[in-house]
Amino acid sequence: MRATLPAFAWGALAALCCAVPLVAAADSATDRVAVLAQMGAEDDADEFGNLSLRGGALFGYQSHLQHWGLALQNAHYSQDGWSENVAGVIGLYRNQRADTLEGLRAEAGIVSVAGNARPVGDITWSHRPRESTGVELIAAGDVVGTRAAIERGISYGLLAASVEQQFGARVTGILLGGWQPFTDGNSRALLRARLIVGLLPEQGLSLQARWRQYRSSDRDVDDAYFNPGEYRNWDAGLSLRRRVGGWTVSGLAGAGRERVDQESWQTTGIAELRAEGPLAGKARIAVNLLYSRAAGFAATDDYWYGSANVNVIIPLAR
């Protein structure tokens, strides 16, 4: 479908993403409106950058875990004098328990890339049938972040399911399987696993070991993005999650190895830091920093990727 951002998408998206939560929100006398502002920056070894902006309104706002809304966004991709804007409209919905994060967290919408209207989103439904067991269903999609893929309007989707199981007081295992189709006809079968061992539970310190792999259905994607027939990666490291006042601070630092097809194993590394908490009044901010030295969508030797994101929610007085 060729369009910049079809007019019918606005109405259809608003109806799809907002009709149900609108009815539910109308019953609460404590609901209010909030302003949402997000900014993100990305860079990598290919000097492929992305500056993303999102702004919108949240309705039926009870907390950062309970609201719905609409937002406009734009991602400005650039590399070596080339640039492209990918703009879109996004519907937002969140209804999760504060103690377990059970419930639904969803954002879904349409963006315009290379004259094509593409669906994007990130939807996760989580449930704990028992205190020691968790289940998640995931649906997601986005544009493929390389210059060649953006010029051709290539995007991807993701359908996945994961199971989390606690073994005793200190050990947790997570297994995820998924399918990742691309609009160019390629697809990937995904498998990921994680083992978490609590070292100092009272301090929030854990040891994590992770495995991820995928197999591609079509090796030839005309160099639009990094696409080996088979990719495998493992890493291990320390993670920390603590509450400091009203803030939640978490971090991860680790290293591992990756293998592309039958080539030799290469060293990888990852570092991540996230902080979320209150600002003045009822406002809330979340900051996330990430640095990774593992393969992504770009086919570059000694690849690295870095990102920084800031998310601010400001409830308005009624």
Residue ranges of model-derived segments:
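Bacterial N-terminal signal peptides
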Residues: A9-P21
